[in-house]
């Protein structure tokens, strides 16, 4: 199976990629570096705690790096010409986790091969930080992870995996991203295993959640 991952550089993305690669060899990773400038503060008050916790949780005393067997490219924007040249290969699956919105051109290039890791319950919360918006709305039963096909709308594609988080009394807010990432690993591995067996399960999103940013 020929697998491409489109992502950004961070501890939880690195851990995700390495875990997938252990069972299904990843051919290439393209990291996107662009960021959207805002005229207001976007850093969360617990971001530093989150980063520190994830480095310990995922890597402890080992080096935080992508496995040496994976080809890695770093570009500004996954939708630019350089990226499109890199991804013209015949990939069987393109996994999107953490980069910007994918252009309609790339969606059409890969048709039904693009899957998205959405750290939230997409049927209820679309867009960025869906898990935090669920908390804001006191909607604790709709915190989890969704794996879905990518279509030309945002987080509305057919669902391949959806699972809610199990919370422990000792959990902190900065543990949340690691929990949704662990579910992402479970969901993507389940999808790839089903794909290997020719037993693909998907369901349409009947409820289309509100978009948050």
Where in the sequence are the language-model features?
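One-carbon transfer enzymes
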Residues: 1-213
């Amino acid at each position: 199976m020929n697998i491409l991952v489109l992502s950004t550089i961070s501890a939880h993305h690195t851990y995700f990629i390495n875990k997938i690669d252990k069972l299904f060899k990843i051919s290439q990773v393209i990291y996107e570096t662009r960021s959207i400038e805002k005229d207001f503060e976007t850093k969360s008050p617990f971001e530093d705690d989150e980063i520190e916790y994830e480095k310990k949780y995922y890597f402890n005393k080992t080096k935080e790096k992508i496995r040496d067997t994976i080809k890695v490219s770093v570009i500004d924007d996954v939708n630019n010409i350089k990226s499109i040249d890199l991804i013209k290969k015949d990939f069987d699956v393109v996994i999107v986790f953490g980069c910007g919105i994918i252009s309609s051109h790339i969606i059409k290039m890969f048709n039904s091969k693009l899957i998205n890791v959405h750290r939230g319950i997409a049927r209820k919360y679309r867009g960025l930080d869906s898990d935090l918006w669920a908390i804001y709305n006191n909607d604790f039963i709709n915190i989890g992870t969704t794996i879905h096909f990518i279509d030309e709308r945002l987080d509305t594609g057919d669902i391949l995996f959806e699972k809610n988080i199990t919370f422990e009394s000792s959990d902190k807010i900065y543990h949340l991203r690691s929990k949704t990432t662990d579910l992402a690993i479970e969901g993507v591995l389940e999808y790839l295993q089903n794909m290997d067996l020719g037993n693909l399960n998907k369901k349409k999103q009947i409820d289309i959640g509100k978009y948050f940013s």
